């Protein structure tokens, strides 16, 4: 049996730009893509914390160190600059791999710089004072 599992997420990133007339996708700072083990063209789900919108698109690489999180194409109607988002990638794997897999969970600051990298999707780092763990 195959299971679809959390592969990686970038938690509470701030959208820095949007371009309605771009062909689509989400532009992500290359440093964050590396931290989250994302590659260009990989499917990602965007969850907008501010308005509850969810959408599926694909990642493209932004300038390294820029902090860019850019919403492109029609998604710009749903997600806006300044919104807090969670970027999620899932992987499909066999049961044994799924049970052992360690996702990459990236927390960022207000400038979209990595402040914590972990593997527990429910863990909240000490620096995230506004968040509560479900555990």
Swiss-Prot record:
The active site is at residues 25, 58. It comes from the Bacteria. Binds 1 pyruvoyl group covalently per subunit. One of its GO terms (molecular function) is aspartate 1-decarboxylase activity. Keywords: Autocatalytic cleavage, Cytoplasm, Decarboxylase, Lyase, Pantothenate biosynthesis, Pyruvate, Schiff base, Zymogen. Is synthesized initially as an inactive proenzyme, which is activated by self-cleavage at a specific serine bond to produce a beta-subunit with a hydroxyl group at its C-terminus and an alpha-subunit with a pyruvoyl group at its N-terminus. GO terms for cellular component: cytosol. PANTHER family: ASPARTATE 1-DECARBOXYLASE (PTHR21012:SF0). Catalyzes the pyruvoyl-dependent decarboxylation of aspartate to produce beta-alanine. Belongs to the PanD family. Heterooctamer of four alpha and four beta subunits. This is Aspartate 1-decarboxylase. It comes from Mycobacterium sp. (strain KMS).
